[in-house]
Every structure is written in structure tokens, then in C-alpha cells.
Regions:
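Flexible loop and strand-edge segments within Gram-negative outer membrane beta-barrel domains
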Residues: 276, 282, 287-289, 308-367, ...
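Outer-membrane beta-barrel translocator/receptor signature
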Residues: 199-201, 212-283, 289-296, 304-307
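Gram-negative outer-membrane beta-barrel transporters
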Residues: 607-611, 615, 620-622, 628-716
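N-terminal periplasmic accessory domains that precede
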Residues: 95-99, 141-144, 161-164, 176, ...
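C-terminal beta-signal and adjacent terminal beta-strands/loops
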Residues: 554, 611-613, 617, 707-725, ...
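Short acidic/polar hinge/loop motifs at secondary-structure boundaries
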Residues: 65, 180-207
Length: 800
């Protein structure tokens, strides 16, 4: 009897439980755009538990009825969106909103107002992609940028190449590497950027001060070196590039490996090694011009749409030989070098690098984090640290033989935060704050007078950028930025120099110590700078468009322009800064016209740059030292006008044959003194005929003609010097420019499929085919030797 009662009770419980599990709950959902909260019509919702599909209505809504207690498993997708996987707990009637990101697959690490992804560009810029960068794997940044019209270089030989944009270089050009502004004693003409170009997937050159996010002092422009784009999927890939060349009898090797996961985690590592011996001109060895270089970088992080972080480290070390004959002992050596057709010091080929030389090590660490806020925008916070160690060795004897004549250690810290308001598709804003601290230590134990003193530098900046799409054919961008720069230095001045430059009249309050023949002074300067830009783009029709931009930029004087005072050994000249130097102010107006159709692309870019308090250095006499007489180069200020035109023409002649032309012309005038500016690039034109055929293993061949005109517009800085050995006065001709020259170059490459996932590209390049003897106006060593002769390069590139 008891068993029957228990059995009946159990049946009742089961029946009641069954009724309690009736599936009567409803779930209502809404699909919206992550940025602006607008409804998404036609989104697909897959309910995995029920194996059922439904779609959202024109208000972005959907409903699932008759659900039971528990969890439902949903996959929500829409065209151009990343599929979203969610779990929803059901224990009552429930509603929830889901947001989808419409452009998640196009996310970029750095967004600027003028990038190659934007169809409507409001400023003049050019992008070099990975195929071009790979071809220059064995070269440096300055070499690869010469592929852009309007971009040239100012050289100290062939291994120290400093980029120049529309006639401006050094502190007037901002160089960004992986989102970090490079700080590596960029004030020196003979200081090449410490960047391994193999870390870049693309390089963007922005002409003028139209990228205020990076700085308000980019009077010349901005160079943005961007790393590989992270692929958010399970993948392992890499590449290796081996290049050998005859001129310098050296090689370059680069290898990279990247790993990423579908969860968004990634890591990649890259390394580069270069070794070259003495290079050759058409007639002789360029003694002591070898190069030893090594670089390494490591990057890891997490990349998701709503949040992520990145940790980056890079190390670059260069040992660079300086042409032996460029090291002069006195003014007579310089006169003899200028009057000689050949190098004055030629020895047999060697891999040895002796004094004079440079040893430079640069390390960079960056940590950044970003977080997206629904219906609002994206917050980014970044900290970076850089250490730059620079040694410059002179020909010395005795106990100082192996001691550097210049020993600088520069530490730079930077903290940046920005917020991008992008909830509205046709207008975005970005605001940001930047703070930086820099400490320079000039080792006093070199045995020579320090060229650059110890100093502490503090920077603070804030900016606002706006981008507006007016209609389908027009776009307007604007930006404004404020910076304050404070520098505190301690420096010794010879009392004779102090009085000679009339500092005793204006700066006696800076003196903090008396050391017999020298004053110890403590200069403290604060500079306030305003910068602004505006750009407009309009598409006239399918083939024609134009762009106009205006930029106001302000730049504080750099430490060299302020404090240089002594013999710069690697430059073999005495350099004198000016404590009275004030900010440069640039007003740049630019306009471009573009014509594009399937066969013809033509771009004409004009600019005019008016610069007040333009700081430049030029020779104006000689000075006797215990080592002999050396030319004296003074920093001066003037009002400068620079204007020019850059032309690009790409013509598809047939399916396989094409023609390209790049032409640049620039003129620089010293408006205050009614004369030409020094160190302005000569006009040049480059013509290339190319053949390509994808059916022949992606075969490419190009013949390039590069003609550089003689620079006839230059200031007369010649002066007479007394030569003791001949007891005569001789004209020191530092101003005359070299003759025009024409170079022919050839390159070809083809790609073979080694395996399913591995390709091998074989490339052959010949530069200066005719072994032409020439000297470039902007090569600082043009007084002492001819430029490079013929060079054969063989490159093997594996992609896996």
C-alpha cells in the first residue's frame, strides 16, 4: 500500500514538473550599429538550439517565441560585419540590444586624416607599399623615399641618407615609426634616421603640416612608417629576404615571422643584418665607407574590436664608416680636396671600419591600449621610451686614439592619449593630449669641447582634428594644435666667444659660474607654438578631382641651432648656434589636380611655403684652432619662400607595357637678403618604361632614366683663405654646385611557387649602368669624392 502511494506521488511530481517546463517565454532583440546606434535591417540571427534562422526588421528588431528555461545560443551576422556569437539566459520574458561593427575588417592601427584608404584626400600624400619596400630591403629609409616625387635626400656619403620633403629636412620633418615619434638627435645633417625599413609594411609621406596629431612642427611634412597589419585569424606566416651586391661586396639579410589567433592575440619578430665593405666610385675605392648594421624588433598584443593592447620593442645598431678623405686636418686640406678630381686618400678594398666613423644604437619601447565606447568612439593611451647613444670618432693619437670625440646619450619619454568621436559616419573628431620629457647627457670625458650641452626638455601639446564628408564628392578636414616647449641647459662658453657674439649684452643673467677662461651658463627658454590646418577635396567627375590645403606650423629651435659651439669633428667644421634663435613660423598653401582613368593617371601638385625666422647654417669664414684652421658655419635666421611643383604621370600603353614619369622642381629664396637659399634640391625628372606579364611567373622588368639638373640657384658663400705653405691667398669655393648628370638603372623580378604556401621571388637590379662619374649637390662629401659607381644586386625573397 505504501509503495502504491509513493508511486502515485512520484507520477504527480513528474506531471507537475512537465507542466512547469512549458516553453512560453519570449525573447526580443534589437540589432544596432555600434558607432551611431542606428537600426540594422536584414541582420541574420541563427538560433543554434532550434536550428532556425530569422532576420531583423526595418527597425532592427526580432523576436523568438515559445522558449524554455535555459540558454539559447545565437549567431548574429550582417554584410560587412564580423559575426557575433552570444549566449542568452532565458528564465522569463527577456529583451536585449546587440551592436554590430560595420567596418571591423578595415580597422587600422593608426588613423590619420590623410591615408591611402581614404578615397577623398585633403592633403598631398603618397604611400609606398610592401613590394617597393622589400625591393629596397638592403637600403635605408632615405633611399626608398626617393621613389616619391618631391622627396629627395641630403647625404653624408651613401650610407647616411636623410629624407628631405620639398626642400626641408631634419627637425622640420617628423618621422613616426609604429605610432612613435622618433627621437634620435635628428637635428644633425649627418644623423640618419635609426629605422630598419624592413619593419614597415607601408610608408606614408604627408607633405606639409597637415597631420597635427603627430606634431605641430612638421614644416616639411611627416613620414609615417607603419608595421604589418594584424590578421585576426589562426595563422603563421613570414618572409626572408637575402640581398647581395657587388659595390661594397656586401649583403643584407632580413627575416620575419608572425603568429596570430582568431581570438585576436598576436606576436611577430623581425631581424635584419647588413655588412658592407668600402664602396666604389667609377674610378677608385671610397676608403673607409663600410657599414655594419643589425636590427631586431618584437611585437605582441591583443586586437579585438572593442579593446586591445600592443607592446613593441625595437633595437637598431649601426657602425658607419666616414670617407677617409673627408677628414681634413686644416683649411689647406679642404682647398686641396676641392681642387682635386679624385679622392685624396685611396687604399685597397677593406671591410675594416676605422676613424672617422659613427657608432649609433637606438632602442624603443612602446605600450599602448585602446578601448571603444558604444555610440561614442575610441580611447587610446600610449607610453613610449627611447634611448639613443651616439659616438662620433675622429682621427686621434695617443691615449685618446680610441675615445669618441662626441659621446651623446639621449633618453626620451612620451605619454599620449586621444579620443576619437566616430559615432557619426559623415563627421568624426579627434582630441588628444601629449606630454614628453627628454634628457641629453654629453659626456665631458671625451677630451674635446662638447658641441651639444647637457639639457632637459619638456613638451606639452593638445590638438583637435575634425573630418567632414560634405557629400558624395566633397570632403573638408581641419585641425588645430597648441604646444609649449621648455628647455633647460647647462653649457660652458669661452669668455672670448661669449663677448664676440655679444651675449654679454643680452644674456649675462644666465651666467652661474666663472671657470677662468670660461663661463658656465644656464639657458632656460620657453616657446609657445600654435599650429592649424584645413583641407578641402572635391571630385569633379569620375576622372577629375582637385585638392586644396593650408597649414600653419610653428617650430621651436632645436638644441643644435641654439647651443652649437665648437668643432664638429665628423663634419670637419666649426658650428656656432645662436641663443637668440626664435620659433620658425610656416604658412604653406598647396593645391593638387588629379586625372585618373583605366589607362592614364596624372597628378600635379603645387605648393608655396612662407617661413618666418627660417633657421639655416652656412659658412662665413675660418677660425684657427690648435688642430689648424677650419671653416666656420653659423646658424642664421631669415624670411624664406619656397615654392615648387611635383608631377606624376602613369600611362598604360598596352596590357603589358607601361610608362611612368616623376618630375620635381623647387625654388628657395632668402627674402630678407634677396638671394637664393642654400641646400635646395636641383630639378630632376625620372622616366621608367616597364613590362609585366603575370602569365610568366609574374614577370616584371623596368628600365629607369634619372636626370638631375645642375643647381644654378645658390648663395655665394665663397671667401679667401691664407695658405701658409705657399704664403698666398686662395679662394675657398664652397658654393659652386656640381654638373648635371644622368643615371640609367634596371631591375627585373619573377616569382615561382615553391610549395602550396611558399613563394620565391628572384630579383636582379643594376644601378648606374653606364658607370657614370657624378657628384650630387646635396651630398656633403661631394667636395672630396665622386658618388657611387655601377652596382649589381641579386635578391632572393621567400614568403611563407
Amino acid at each position: 500500500m505504501i509503495q502504491k502511494i509513493f508511486f502515485c506521488t512520484f507520477l504527480c511530481f513528474i506531471t507537475f514538473a512537465g507542466y512547469s517546463q512549458q516553453c512560453t517565454y519570449n525573447f526580443k532583440g534589437t540589432i544596432t550599429d555600434y558607432h551611431d546606434g542606428t537600426s540594422i535591417f536584414g541582420a541574420t540571427i541563427f538560433i543554434k538550439n532550434l536550428n532556425k534562422y530569422i532576420t531583423s526588421d526595418n527597425q532592427g528588431k526580432f523576436e523568438i517565441e515559445n522558449l524554455c528555461n535555459g540558454k539559447i545560443h545565437l549567431f548574429i551576422s550582417h554584410i560587412s560585419c564580423e559575426t557575433k556569437e552570444v549566449f542568452v539566459t532565458i528564465n522569463k520574458n527577456t529583451s536585449k540590444e546587440f551592436s554590430l561593427e560595420h567596418h571591423s575588417e578595415e580597422l587600422k592601427e593608426v588613423r590619420i586624416s590623410s591615408t591611402s584608404e581614404l578615397k577623398m584626400k585633403t592633403t598631398q600624400f603618397t604611400v609606398l607599399k610592401s613590394d617597393v619596400i622589400d625591393a629596397y630591403s638592403s637600403k635605408n629609409l632615405g633611399d626608398v623615399l626617393k621613389n616619391i616625387s618631391g622627396v629627395s635626400a641630403i647625404n653624408t656619403g651613401n650610407t647616411i641618407v636623410k629624407p628631405m620633403i620639398n626642400g626641408l629636412h631634419s627637425s622640420r620633418v617628423i618621422l613616426m615609426t609604429n605610432g612613435v615619434r622618433l627621437q634620435d638627435q635628428e637635428w644633425g645633417i649627418e644623423h640618419a634616421p635609426n629605422i630598419d625599413i624592413n619593419t614597415a609594411e607601408k610608408i606614408t609621406v604627408i607633405k606639409g603640416a597637415n597631420a597635427l596629431e603627430f606634431g605641430g612642427d612638421a614644416i616639411g611634412g611627416v613620414i609615417v612608417v607603419a608595421p604589418n597589419r594584424i590578421i585576426v585569424k589562426d595563422s603563421l606566416y613570414g618572409k626572408s629576404i637575402l640581398t647581395g651586391q657587388t659595390n661594397g661586396q656586401g649583403f643584407s639579410f632580413h627575416s620575419s615571422l608572425s603568429k596570430s589567433t582568431k581570438e585576436g592575440y598576436y606576436v611577430n619578430a623581425k631581424t635584419t643584418v647588413k655588412k658592407y665593405g668600402d664602396f666604389e666610385s667609377p674610378g677608385y675605392i671610397l676608403t673607409n665607407t663600410g657599414l655594419n648594421s643589425e636590427a631586431f624588433s618584437l611585437q605582441t598584443g591583443l586586437k579585438k574590436f572593442e579593446h586591445g593592447f600592443n607592446v613593441y620593442y625595437t633595437y637598431v645598431k649601426n657602425e658607419i664608416g666616414i670617407l677617409k678623405s673627408s677628414h681634413i686636418g686644416n683649411i689647406e686640406d679642404l682647398v686641396n680636396a676641392i681642387n682635386s678630381d679624385a679622392s685624396m686618400a685611396v687604399k685597397d678594398f677593406s671591410y675594416a671600419i676605422n676613424s672617422p666613423k659613427q657608432e649609433v644604437t637606438h632602442q624603443l619601447v612602446k605600450v599602448d591600449f585602446y578601448k571603444r565606447f558604444k555610440k561614442l568612439g575610441k580611447l587610446t593611451v600610449q607610453y613610449d621610451f627611447q634611448n639613443n647613444k651616439r659616438f662620433e670618432f675622429d682621427n686621434r693619437i695617443g691615449e685618446n686614439k680610441n675615445k669618441a670625440a662626441i659621446d651623446l646619450n639621449l633618453n626620451s619619454h612620451s605619454l599620449k592619449t586621444s579620443f576619437e568621436f566616430d559615432s557619426k559616419s559623415k563627421q568624426t573628431y579627434k582630441v588628444g593630449l601629449v606630454g614628453a620629457y627628454q634628457n641629453n647627457f654629453a659626456n665631458p670625458n671625451t677630451g674635446v669641447k662638447r658641441l651639444i650641452p647637457n639639457y632637459n626638455k619638456y613638451d606639452f601639446g593638445t590638438f583637435v582634428i575634425g573630418n567632414f564628408i560634405i557629400n558624395d564628392n566633397s570632403r573638408l578636414d581641419f585641425g588645430i594644435r597648441y604646444d609649449v616647449n621648455y628647455i633647460n641647459a647647462k653649457k660652458f662658453y669661452l669668455k672670448s666667444r661669449w663677448n664676440e657674439r655679444n651675449y654679454d649684452v643680452d644674456f649675462n643673467d644666465l651666467i652661474i659660474g666663472d671657470f677662468n677662461t670660461q663661463w658656465l651658463v644656464n639657458p632656460e627658454f620657453t616657446y609657445h607654438n600654435m599650429s592649424a590646418s584645413i583641407g578641402f577635396f572635391h571630385q569633379l567627375n569620375d576622372e577629375n578631382s582637385f585638392q586644396f590645403s593650408y597649414a600653419l606650423a610653428s617650430r621651436s629651435p632645436n638644441p643644435s641651432e641654439l647651443f652649437s659651439d665648437g668643432l664638429h669633428h665628423s663634419a670637419a667644421r666649426i658650428e656656432l648656434g645662436d641663443l637668440r634663435a626664435s620659433q620658425e613660423t610656416s604658412n604653406r598653401v598647396a593645391a593638387s589636380y588629379d586625372f585618373r582613368n583605366p589607362k592614364t593617371n596624372v597628378s600635379v601638385a603645387l605648393f608655396f611655403n612662407h617661413i618666418r625666422n627660417f633657421l639655416y647654417i652656412e659658412p662665413n669664414g675660418i677660425e684657427q684652432t690648435i688642430r689648424g684652421a677650419f671653416p666656420v658655419w653659423n646658424y642664421k635666421a631669415t624670411t624664406a619662400n619656397l615654392f615648387g611643383v611635383d608631377i606624376n604621370w602613369q600611362q598604360k600603353i598596352t596590357e603589358h607595357l607601361n610608362f611612368n614619369n616623376k618630375t620635381s622642381f623647387i625654388k628657395g629664396r632668402d627674402a630678407s637678403n634677396g638671394r637664393d637659399l642654400i641646400d635646395i634640391p636641383a630639378a630632376n625628372t625620372q622616366n621608367t618604361v616597364g613590362y609585366s606579364n603575370k602569365k610568366w611567373h609574374h614577370f616584371n622588368a623596368n628600365l629607369e632614366s634619372n636626370f638631375v639638373f645642375k643647381q644654378n640657384l645658390f648663395p655665394n658663400n665663397d671667401f679667401e683663405v691664407f695658405i701658409p705653405t705657399t704664403s698666398s691667398n686662395v679662394l675657398l669655393d664652397l658654393s659652386a654646385t656640381p654638373s648635371s648628370y644622368h643615371l640609367l638603372n634596371f631591375n627585373t623580378d619573377t616569382t615561382f611557387k615553391v610549395s602550396q604556401k611558399t613563394n620565391l621571388t628572384i630579383g636582379i637590379t643594376v644601378t648606374n649602368i653606364l658607370n657614370t662619374k657624378y657628384r650630387a649637390y646635396l651630398n656633403r662629401l661631394r667636395y672630396f669624392a665622386d658618388d657611387l659607381g655601377r652596382n649589381y644586386l641579386l635578391q632572393l625573397k621567400f614568403k611563407y
